[in-house]
Structure formats: C-alpha cells, structure tokens
Amino acid sequence: MGKARRSPPGHHRHCEGCFNRHCHIPVEPNTSCLVISCHLLCGATFHMCKEAEHQLLCPLEQVPCLNSEYGCPLSMSRHKLAKHLQVCPASVVCCSMEWNRWPNVDSETTLHENIMKETPSEECLDTALALQDQKVLFRSLKMVELFPETREATEEEPTMNGETSVEEMGGAVGGVDIGLVPHGLSATNGEMAELSQEEREVLAKTKEGMDLVKFGQWENIFSKEHAASALTNSSASCESKNKNDSEKEQISSGHNMVEGEGAPKKKEPQENQKQQDVRTAMETTGLAPWQDGVLERLKTAVDAKDYNMYLVHNGRMLIHFGQMPACTPKERDFVYGKLEAQEVKTVYTFKVPVSYCGKRARLGDAMLSCKPSEHKAVDTSDLGITVEDLPKSDLIKTTLQCALERELKGHVISESRSIDGLFMDFATQTYNFEPEQFSSGTVLADLTAATPGGLHVELHSECVTRRHNKSSSAFTFTCNKFFRRDEFPLHFKNVHTDIQSCLNGWFQHRCPLAYLGCTFVQNHFRPPGQKAKVIYSQELKTFAIKPEVAPELSEGRKNNHLLGHGGKSQNSLTSLPLEILKYIAGFLDSVSLAQLSQVSVLMRNICATLLQERGMVLLQWKKKRYSHGGTSWRVHREIWQFSSLFSKIKSWEFNEVTSMSEHLKSCPFNIVEHKTDPILLTSMCQPREQARESLVSTFRIRPRGRYVS
C-alpha cells in the first residue's frame, strides 16, 4: 500500500496537478481555488495559489541584475537580463595584452639622447609609450635580487624554502611562545634537534605549537605508525610487563636505601629522580620510533614481514631519531614535521671513467705539459688597485645589463659552470656603485629619482612569443586597463591592433637617418571626418584623440567670460541649463568624461549622471581580522569611474603631410660626401703581368702520349 502524497504548503489538492487554462471546477475550500491571470499581463493563467511560483518565472517580473552582488544597482524585467549583461556597468573586463621591450644597452644611444634633449611631445607616440614602460620597469627591478652582495649588513637574508625563525613565528595565528620552545630547536638555523620525552609532551599540549597546515601529513604518519605498532602489542606485552615489574622493584629498593641512610636531602630531588627513572624505563621498553633499542626489540618480538612493514611506515622517524642510518651521507636529511616539497634541480651527473686521461693541453702544444704551471685566478686584484679606486659604474646601464643577461641567457653574469668532469669555468665581475649598500625594498626607481631623466629602453616593442618565459620577465609589460564588456573590442582594435602594433614604420614614420640621431617623425593617419590627432597622455597612461581647435575659436577665448550676478566672471559654458550640459556631455567619449569630471564640482555632478549608462563599477576589497585570529576579505566600497576608451574609429584616413624626401633635403644628418681623390680598384692592386688562364692553356700543360711499363 503506497503512502499518501501531501500537497505542498499553500497548494490545493486539485490545483497541484491542474494546468488547464480554462478550468471551470467550482471553488471549494482545501480542494481548489479561483483561476486568475498574471497582473503584469504576460499572458499566463493559473490558479491563485500558484501566484508565488509564477513570480519566479514571469518574464515581466522586476528583478535585480545578475551582477547585483558586484555593484550593479539596476533592476529590470526578467526577459531583459541577457541583453543588459552586454552593457552592465559591473561586467568589467581587464585587458591582458602583453608586449616585450628590451633595454638599449648594446645599441646606439645617439637617437635616444637627442630625443631627451627636446621638449616631450604628446604626438611622439613611440617615445611616450617607451617612457611609460621605462617607469614600470624601474619600479620592478629590485637591487638586492640582482646584486645580493650589496644587501645592508643590518638586514637578514630571507629564509629559504619558506622556513621562518622562531622570532618571526610570533602572532595570533600559528605563533609559538618562546618560553615553550624546546632547547633542541635552534632559533638561527631552524634545525630540530632530538627532543626528550618531557619536551615532546609539553610541546604536544601547547595549542600554539600546532602546525595546522601540516595536520593532514602528521595524521597520515601517525595512522601508519599506529597500524604497524598494533601488530606487535600482543606479542610484546608479556615481555614489557616483566621488565617493568623488575625495574619497579629496583627503583623501590633504591629509594628505601636512600631513606635508610638518613641523608639530609629534600623530597623534590627524590621526586625528580623518580620521574627520570620512569621515563628511562619507558624509553627502553616502548615500540615508538624515538625510543632507544626499538629495532632490537622488534627483531625478537615480531616476524620479518611485520618488521619490514614497520620500517616502511616509520623509516623517516627512525632516521631522524638516530635509530638507523640515512641512505644519503647528508646529515639531517629528513626533518620530522617539515614535509615540504623539494625543488627539483638539474645537476651535472657526468662521471669520469677510470680509463679516462685528460690531455687537453696537448691539443694546442705538445710540450706544454712539460712546462711548469701554476694556478692563478684572473680577478680585479690583478689590476693592482683597490675596489674603491675603480671608476663608479653606471647604475642604470649596469642594472639593465644584468637583468637582460639573466632574461636572455637564462643565468646571471659570472655564473660558474662545469665544462666536463675535470674542469669548471669560474668568472667574477666587479661593480662599484655610488650607494654601496641597498635595503631589501630598494628598486631602481628610488635611486634614479634625483637624476635627470633619460631613455634607456628601445623605442619599438616586440610581441610575446612562446619561446619567451614571460612569467618571471621584467621586460614583459601588460596593459591592465579595465573596460566594460561592450568597450573592450573597441579598445583592443583601436589601441593595440591599429596604433601600438604599427608604430614602427606604418602608423608613425621616423626619418631614415634616425640611426644617426635625427628625431624627425611623421604621423600618417588620423580619425576620419574630423581634424584630430592621436596623442599619448602620460597622466592618463593611455592613448587619446585630441581635436584640432580652429584659430578663430582660440582667439575668442579671451572674450569667453560673462559677468555674473555678484559681478564675478562666469564662464559661458557653466551658465547653460543642466539639461543642455548633460546633453553635450553625452557626446563625449569615456576618457573625455573622466577629464571633464575633474574640472569643477558642477561638471563632476553632470558626469555623475552618466555613470550608470557610460561608466563602470569596481569593488575595493579590504582584509578584515577577527578577534580569534582568522581573516577574511570583505567589500570595502564601490568605485564608479569612466574607462580610458576614446571615440570609436572604424577606419583611418591619411594625414596631409609632406613626403619624407622633402625632409631629407633639409635634414641636418643628410650630409653628402663628394669623393674627389682617385681610388684603386681591386684588379689594379695585383701585378699587371699575369699569365692569362684559359681552357686551351690548361690542356696544353698536360703531357701527351701513353706510358709504357
């Protein structure tokens, strides 16, 4: 017999399974209810008790945006949600375009020096973008990482492999009280010495000493240990009991002898001695890996199979506590409680054969092995001067060269490398900087803030390829601009595809004699339909469109002020009604709205009315700490702003500029060199009387006839 099915709360027995729009069943309590239509006129008809369910499906129901948790304040009909996501202010995309820009330490710097002598121009796009990338590069190069010898003596080097000293472990979470740290734990090198049983118990009872991150690894070890030890409990219980009884009798007789002698000793030393004897007895009878003689007791108590299983599960602990030798000669190879992933390093595994005899010297001189030889290192000391007397190294060029060497070659300068099994190359490089010591947080930008600016990177950039390791590269730059989802395709096409990738020779054309130092540059393209030019703003760190103002409008700026009610000068633009100002602001692009909002309070309020339609919202997160020591990230506030997108440009038009040949006629670097002195040709350098070789003369030289043997 089946169980009776109950209707959902609020539903009637008939209404639960009725889907007829023309249902005419009479209304009865607890059975059926009236059939109604949706009050939003979506066309649905249903029983009145299903109205709450219909609100979850009605396409005309007002619901918040799907990105309401990310800051979107708009509400709309349910059927408009998908279309709204394309223009949602909370649907933000970060541009991940990357490019490489290398330093110019090996190239000619005449052009870079001449460019920096001139006044910086917004129209020189490659120079402005290179200067911006140079600022980012200088803020990312840490001096201590490139030159570890220049670290300040007061600072300690960071611990390797994530190990921290005892002094650094203090805190609310995961900290260890210094008073509870056993004597076997060194605070300097972080190595764990062998602990006594009393120190283990104190450390185990201390809640602050627990390493919760490695709890799973500890639990796995102890579970295997318990499983292996459980096999030996039954066989070793009798033997351990007999030994304990005999040792207790010896301890009690010893105490009676001491009391009978009547020596003037206190009770506290006797109790300490008793506890020490008990611990000694436990150390010699237990089967734990840290107890003495555990392997000898296991050999007699269990069979070979259980003994080998115990070694497999407790091998690391037995090696650490000195019960068995390690498989490698390195001491302290396995540290209990520090089960960290070891970094895989490539080593040279070449072994010299027994019959190998190195005779590299005979490759050049057979008698070199007979000559006396001596070991001598080539170093800066061979110059006969001290390091202080050496000329100061260029800080910027030296830093960029060392960073470039590690990036392109894969290793630092002066790295030792093994040639074969017998020889190794050693190299040293001495640098003498003006500041002799650097702190751990010092970057190259901090040291070059007071020096005059210069251009130390290439003007042209390169695309990132698969051969280049961009994860740890200091010369890989990222756009990292935020845009709304509908703005991102326009940004990528206009900025990265049309402008940035075509700066070297197409969108922007430099003089052919630029390698000699000529700074002349031409921009070939402009937006269609208007007189404007493309610029790069250092303040906004992005490209923008700057319209060309007519001369008559520039002259009328002086008379562009009116007198207000208080006799003060009032700008004619601010005197317009708010509706007209908002209408005018609607024609501006996002980057122009961002600049207009910083003009005055009135313009800021006008631009604020366009934020939901043209702007985007970002969440600022803040880390919150609780009283128990835990942390979490919470939304601190919402930030509304405009993106850096300029006007949409589908196609470009050619600028009305003169030909580059016209510039070459007056280029100061285009110097014509007239050759007046005669120059000998190649054929004139040889002797004039020379036998002419021909095919006939070649055959005449050959002897005729046959040789008879």
UniProtKB/Swiss-Prot annotation:
Biased composition (Basic and acidic residues): 240-250, 262-277
Any single Gene Ontology cellular-component annotation: cytoplasm
Single Gene Ontology MF annotation: ubiquitin protein ligase activity
Domain F-box intervals: 570-624
Keyword Manganese: no
InterPro entries xrefs: F-box-like_dom_sf, F-box_dom, Fbxo30/Fbxo40, Znf_RING/FYVE/PHD, Znf_TRAF, Znf_TRAF_N
Tissue: Expressed only in heart and skeletal muscle.
Cleaved signal peptide residues: none
Region described as Disordered: spans on this chain: 232-280
CDD domains in alphabetical order: F-box_FBXO40
Keywords: Cytoplasm, Metal-binding, Ubl conjugation pathway, Zinc, Zinc-finger
Zinc finger (TRAF-type): 53-112
Subcellular location, principal: cytoplasm
Any one GO biological process: muscle cell differentiation
Keyword Zinc set for record: yes
One Pfam family this sequence matches: F-box_4
Compartments, record wording: Cytoplasm
Note: The expression decreases in the dystrophic muscle of Limb-girdle muscular dystrophy (LGMD) patient.
Self-association and partners: Directly interacts with SKP1 and CUL1.
Function noted in UniProt: Probable substrate-recognition component of the SCF (SKP1-CUL1-F-box protein)-type E3 ubiquitin ligase complex that may function in myogenesis.
Database matches in PANTHER family: F-BOX ONLY PROTEIN 40, PROTEIN CBG16327
Identification of the protein by name: F-box only protein 40
Encoding gene, per UniProt annotation: FBXO40
